[in-house]
Amino acid sequence: MFIKIFSAFRKGWKMLPTLELVYEKVKNRNPYEKEYLQATLEVLESLSPLLKKYPEYADDSLLERITEPERQIMFRVPWVDDNGKVQVNRGYRVEFNSALGPYKGGLRFHPTVNLSIIKFLGFEQIFKNALTNQAIGGGKGGSDFDPHKKSNGEIMRFCQAFMTELYRHIGENTDVPAGDIGVGGREIGYLFGQYRKITNRFDAGVLTGKNIHWGGSLARTEATGYGAVLFANSMLHTENKDLEGKTVTVSGSGNVAIYAIEKAQKLGAKVVTFSDSSGFVHDEKGVDLQLLKQIKEVERARVSEYVARRPEAVFYSNQKPWNVPTDVALPCATQNELTGDDAKALVNNGLQIVSEGANMPSTPEAIEIFKKANVKFAPGKASNAGGVATSALEMQQNASREKWSFEKAEAKLTDIMKTIHDDCMQTAEEFDDPFNYVLGANIQGFTRVANAMIDQGII
């Protein structure tokens, strides 16, 4: 498989032979894992300026070790549907790196899930978690189970079957899963219940994203979407601007998208789009957030239902929301959703800022186009780190048997996102590429993990 090496992530840096060799080794070991190879290549490309200045980071096969998971777990998940028929899905947990703390990363339930996607997400999670300055390593898990159109009973039975295998691999100081696509508060509850039954322990910190009534953290539900918007606002602050009066386009209509819309509206922006796999809605007057929440969170219906109740909005079937005039784009759906053609359309429609709410939603071609057009671009490992940062805050509350107010948790989230932004920007400036947030995020995250690995020896 051939993956073109793009120049979007660097300013005049040629990928060093050392890094090219590492990538070739990764590609030879994982020849069919395109998502994982894409994520690995993006990080390795960004490290050329670092290794040119500090070549010791290539010693003792550090790069080879950081690109190979510490542990990959794959297992069958048999469960019984409402018709009494046994179904079998595949479960995954990739425990990628624990140099900074216990493995931390979400569980994704979606029919497209495979080992490549889980490894790409876990690899990104290493550096995302490092950027938060919290004591957490990187991991990811999930299953090809599709919760769409499943009954509550079927989802409960699947979660119980999934945890029956997963429980032996996780723990408050070992590996702490959370939610992701297809895994919300309901699923976390079922997973925790089965863990508690099997172990006969109430280890609140073994999962995050719990209901606030039994160990969850206020502001955790909002954190990923809020964080992406806070990061975008910090990017605008570098130009003495903010989101007040700006037009914002959002993709997705799940948890991340909904709370990105909410935070953007609170900061004075007009959000005009949202989407799902069937198409997107354009509401030129501004999204009615309460209506959207009713449709997606209560009724679990398609976004097309929105226009039936708000006639001034328009639904575009099987299209994406990137051909709409906008100042700020927040891709919050899934990986590689925003292509080169989408990026061209956004640039032609006045785009200034991209802040990724999803994980790797922009293709390399899209990022290259943004770079050439001087559009400021924030990669998900930095801009959507608010979710895992607040998960770490939930772990802190569980460990101390405390429960913080929403205001306290949100204030900590705001501080963390500003620090991540400033650290990325300062690192990019240190390597003579101002506002290259991709380079800044990758180098900053990598050095924190690499330094810990060096200190702890070859293990």
Spans of model-derived segments:
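Adenosine-phosphate binding glycine-rich loop
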Residues: L16-A39, M235-L236, V347-I459
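Flexible, glycine/charged-enriched surface loops at secondary-structure junctions
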Residues: K34-L37, P55-D60, N133, I170-G179, ...
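Structured beta-strand/loop patches that form or line metal/cofactor-binding pockets in enzymes
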Residues: E56-K85
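Glycine/serine-rich phosphate-binding loop and adjoining beta1-alpha1 elements at the start
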Residues: H110, N129-E244
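Glycine-rich phosphate/diphosphate-binding loop of Rossmann-like nucleotide-binding domains
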Residues: N211, G216-N323
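Rossmann-like adenosine-cofactor binding region
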Residues: G279-F377, A382
